[in-house]
């Protein structure tokens, strides 16, 4: 039985950790996760999903604010596991910590590296309208997501997917890929592949500016951005003078000569908006500032000024 220290934080890492806990081939000695954070309107202190799973299974949990030069790092080194496995941990790991693994320190990353190194690979894949994405297991090195590739698996992104659904799918794909890869890695049957630095694409964390959707883009690009920013932080536009979160849109085949942001037509249950390149889309659900999330029917009841030709969406 090989010993593991697992390092992860969000829900993405939970199925991966659970599979290792449930396996008879591995013993999880300890779990390292981010500290408890205050969340929600009530600012309640909440443990990470990974920490909760570890505690449910009686596993030692370490939660350093910063892992480098910490007592928690010393504890991992003391444990001297066969493997250190990370999945969306959220901190850089120093060389001294990586060297504590007797066999290897590896990472489960939510993209097909070298595309989308960084903290938001799944969001960027959806936002950019990629046809597929996947999971990479690679050796950990000091440079971000730059280690040699051990194994990869891919899956398609459909137009019904958003970042939430892809997180779930890639988490399960990562779990299955890891369980398939570890025996080969431990047996020495893996030939790692260096990443092609000329093909590197970065996916830094989403900024506040990126949450504002450019309404002059073609409808299919607007749809990609809406889905890529859902379920959080949710993209926004200024609609009828109010900053409004846009949860769901549908690109249409209908074309128009109207300018982006203008109302094409209003139906009982539909608001059709002009987008870039003569394309159109339908807004399905949204949340104006200071109001609850609502479907378009309820929204239109309070915005009867929106008529064909009206400039419904502006920059501010």
From Swiss-Prot:
Coiled coil: none annotated. Its EC number is 2.1.2.9. This is Methionyl-tRNA formyltransferase. Attaches a formyl group to the free amino group of methionyl-tRNA(fMet). The formyl group appears to play a dual role in the initiator identity of N-formylmethionyl-tRNA by promoting its recognition by IF2 and preventing the misappropriation of this tRNA by the elongation apparatus. HAMAP family: Formyl_trans. It holds the Pfam family Formyl_trans_N. The keyword Transferase applies.
């Amino acid at each position: 039985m090989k010993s593991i220290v697992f390092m992860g934080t969000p829900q993405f890492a939970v199925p991966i950790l659970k599979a290792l806990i449930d396996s008879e081939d591995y013993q999880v000695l300890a779990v390292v996760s981010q500290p408890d954070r205050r969340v929600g309107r009530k600012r309640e202190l909440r443990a990470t999903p990974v920490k909760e799973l570890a505690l449910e299974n009686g596993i030692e949990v370490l939660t350093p604010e910063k892992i480098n030069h910490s007592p928690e790092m010393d504890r991992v080194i003391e444990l001297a596991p066969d493997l250190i496995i990370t999945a969306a941990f959220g901190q850089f790991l120093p060389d001294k910590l990586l060297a504590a693994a007797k066999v290897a320190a590896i990472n489960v990353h939510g993209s097909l590296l070298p595309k989308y190194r960084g903290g938001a690979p799944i969001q960027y894949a959806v936002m950019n309208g990629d046809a597929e994405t996947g999971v990479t297991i690679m050796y950990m090195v000091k440079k971000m997501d730059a280690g040699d590739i051990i194994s990869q698996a891919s899956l398609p992104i459909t137009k019904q997917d958003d970042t939430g659904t892809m997180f779930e799918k890639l988490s399960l794909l990562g779990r299955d890929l890891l369980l398939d890869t570890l025996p080969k890695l431990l047996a020495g049957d893996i030939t790692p592949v260096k990443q092609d630095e000329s093909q590197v694409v970065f996916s830094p964390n989403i900024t506040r500016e990126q949450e504002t959707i450019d309404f002059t883009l073609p409808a299919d690009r607007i749809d990609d951005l809406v889905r890529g920013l859902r379920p959080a932080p949710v993209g926004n536009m200024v609609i009828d003078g109010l900053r409004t979160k846009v949860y769901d849109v549908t690109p249409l085949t209908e074309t128009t000569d109207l300018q982006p942001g203008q109302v094409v037509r209003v139906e009982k249950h539909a608001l059709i908006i002009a987008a870039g390149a003569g394309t159109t889309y339908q807004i399905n659900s949204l949340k104006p500032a200071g109001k609850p999330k609502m479907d378009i029917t309820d929204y239109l009841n309070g915005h009867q000024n929106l008529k064909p030709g009206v400039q419904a969406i502006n920059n501010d």
